[in-house]
Amino acid sequence: MADLSQIVKAYDVRGVVPDQWDESLAELFGAAFAEITGADAIVIGHDMRPSSPGLSGAFARGAAARGTGVTLIGLCSTDELYFASGSLGLPGAMFTASHNPAQYNGIKMCRAGAAPVGQDTGLAEIRALVERWADEGAPPPAATTGTVTRRDVLGDYAAHLRGLVDLSGIRPLKVVVDAGNGMGGHTVPTVFEGLPLELDAMYFELDGSFPHHEANPLDPKNIVDLQARVRETGADLGLAFDGDADRCFVVDENGDPVSPSAITALVAARELAKHPGGTVIHNLITSWSVPEVVRENGGEPVRTRVGHSFIKEEMAKSGAIFGGEHSAHYYFRDFWNADTGMLAAMHVLAALGGQQGPLSELVAQYDRYAASGEINSTVDDQAGRLAALKAAHQDRAGVTLDELDGLTVTADDWWFNVRASNTEPLLRLNVEARDAATADRVRDEVLAVIRA
């Protein structure tokens, strides 16, 4: 019996090629995706990894063999695939392993309108079909093979984004962009073309071997080059995209990282100016500043668990205009509730270019507290350590506990959250406080229990 448990994750397919999966499995995934969605046609895109064209082509053959029409959009970012799914009204599949090393590849799937496909929304059924067909053989082809066509949507994607954020009137800005040899090198030149931006392009050559650094800007070592270039050139800001360019990380004119919570608050304020009284989603480890800014701007903040499936589900349910996560994923109602780091970056450029001050001053109003960042601890007994933390705090005066996602403990001047990793023996700690000394004290107290 084929076992796909190592590569079928909560939200996508991801594993080492060809050790864990290959084109023969990709073809079965294409057939299963066509079967489960029941679509007449689908759209497929891929990133710059060496294995991506072959895997995406095999997926297309599998879907076409079931009688499903296929539109191939070729090289694209993940949010460009979401644009294609939304604008064409088709289910989609994106071949990428995002920020993972070169030997990995994966599939992010969505239904028409960029609606997510995860374990509870079709991925479990797709896995079951692939496992069955891997053992019994693929089903016989449909009477009529689906037509495979090619389409370039990059220009339409760029035009759609530029229609959502007007950058034409901003003051000229010098911006350094580190694409990490990922798909930002493909999308940024077209999106930024003709705008009042002096673009300093770093690592725009598409190269799935990632010769300069991993395409994961949340790891501080991967933005060192960007920070240095911003400081050396006197740029107004720096932007770093991950491998599939759906996440964007920002550094200010001093080369200092801007927290994704501050970006979430800034974008929320701008979206609320367009959609007064709207709802904004934030996960439970974003800063206190996010719900504060949302309320100050007349909006309604809604707190969710960590993870894009929870954000997108809540956005669809509440009609939210925007959602943000600590991981630099940003979701927009105007983009089919899907995440697009490019659109968030354009909001930052518009906000910065619409006034005269530097970015560090602009974001200071949204960055109000001291935070630990995420601290991971290897723990054999995750449940036991969480229980010990709960026992240590449940009778303390002036604190509240909730277990929406892991354990969150909140006091007047600090809070912390501890969550177990779904895939590794780790506990993840995030602390925030009104001052750095308090944040350090709470961090050390909690780690003492976690690592006891």
Q: Model segments located where?
A:
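Short glycine-rich phosphate-binding loop at a beta-alpha junction
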Residues: 40-47, 71, 174-176, 278-284, ...
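Active-site nucleophile and cofactor-binding loops and adjacent substrate-binding regions
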Residues: 70-79, 257-260, 282-283, 304-305
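N-terminal small/polar loop signature for handling phosphorylated ligands or for N-terminal nucleophile
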Residues: 42-105, 162, 190-251
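Gly/Ser/Thr-rich active-site loops/lids in small-molecule metabolic enzymes
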Residues: 196, 201-203, 256-275, 308, ...
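An N-terminal, well-structured beta->alpha segment
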Residues: 1-61, 65-67, 91, 147-173
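Phosphate-binding and adjacent anionic-ligand microenvironments
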Residues: 237, 275-452
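Gly/Ser/Thr-enriched, mixed-charge loops and adjacent short helices
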Residues: 105-233
